[in-house]
Amino acid sequence: MRKASLLLLVPLLAACSSTLDAGQQYDGGDANYVMWDESERQDPVSASGTTFEGDDINLEDLRGDVVIINTWYAACPPCRAEAADLNAIAEDYAGDVTVIGVNVRDNAATAQAFERSFATPYESIDGTDGSFIADLEGTVPLQAVPTTLILDAEGRPAARYIGQINPEIVRGMIDDTL
């Protein structure tokens, strides 16, 4: 019986591990965030999508800028809780950083109501078909919302924060990426 229990535990523990956490922890042992040294960064990522307003956004067109990508949806409690912090970051770093939201679940009316309610100063891509996040596979967990990804000026993943952000930590990551 004990051997059978152990055999059941092995796949469960293996499922909890992830190669997404490769890289250097930015500060402390919090596994929710990671920042990669410049020499360890992956190749530039390529993804594109259309905002709820009908504008096309292509990450390749943003090379030369530091880009912050944040996945969210309107009914997500941590997404709502971090909205003011992301707005402040977008405003404080305007001109140095491009912030893009990726709504992974809502229809246009719901997403736009959220953006109006929180006075979001940046556009969000309609990511409900999953293709934008799928293009970031290996960098952003497909089901982890919210996730915030910071790309360096070359378009390479520099840092990632899974869950509701701590704005001081994310600001430090941005400063180190700039």
Q: What are these regions, as identified by a protein language model?
A:
Residues 37-67:
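A short beta-strand-turn-helix
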Residues 1-48:
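N-terminal targeting signals for export/organelle localization
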Residues 116-120, 128-176:
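Thiol/disulfide oxidoreductase modules built on the thioredoxin-like
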